[in-house]
A protein has these predicted regions:
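Surface-exposed repetitive/solenoidal architectures
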Residues: 1-188
């Protein structure tokens, strides 16, 4: 980026999808992408799917991102699904951004689903539904380091503060990262 990009609340189609994921390098030069809406589909985010990509040095603010396919939708403030050695570095999602979906645990403030992905030096102040402050679902090969989330959760069950779900077969590493939020439990 050479400047902030303001979508003025217009709709945005996610960059990359399952058939043709984003595989390049995106360096935001510490600017912001602001005020966009992504709704619908299987992969909702600024980037829908990234594989072997390098995405770094920018923030998202004022966005509304919602995955709407009932059982398989992923949503993330930066990327919905990341894999194949993707690196997310020095990116953030600011307060005023809402990330949600129809499936619990499949959306996160930064990324909805990760496998073989490194996330380094990120933060999220997003409002999330039943997802994670940083990651919704962390599968094998996920590395999260030097990152934090400070979220507002709007759903029942509530979202969690860093990662909603970690694959129990192992292979996820979390170092020097934490999450805080507005509540720790939900009751009717």
């Amino acid at each position: 980026l050479r400047n902030d990009i303001d979508f003025a609340n217009a709709s945005h189609t996610s960059i990359g999808d399952h058939t043709t994921p984003f595989t390049g390098k995106f360096d935001g030069n510490f600017f912001q992408v602001k005020n966009f809406n992504v709704s619908g589909g299987y992969r909702a985010g600024l980037f829908g799917e990234a594989n072997g990509a390098r995405i770094e040095n920018f923030g998202v603010s004022g966005a509304t991102i919602t995955g709407t396919v009932a059982t398989t939708a992923y949503a993330g403030g930066i990327v919905a699904v990341s894999s194949g050695g993707t690196l997310l570095k020095n990116v953030y999602v600011a307060a005023g951004t809402t990330v949600g979906g129809t499936q619990n645990g499949r959306h996160g403030g930064i990324v909805g689903y990760t496998t073989n992905t490194t996330i380094d030096g990120v933060y999220s102040k997003a409002t999330v539904g039943s997802g994670g402050g940083i990651i919704g679902f962390a599968a094998t090969g996920t590395v999260l380091k030097d990152s934090y989330s400070d979220i507002v959760s709007t759903a029942s069950p509530p979202g969690t503060f860093a990662i909603y779900y970690i694959n129990p077969t192992g292979g996820t590493t979390v170092t020097n990262s934490y999450g805080i939020g507005d509540r720790f439990s939900y009751s009717n």
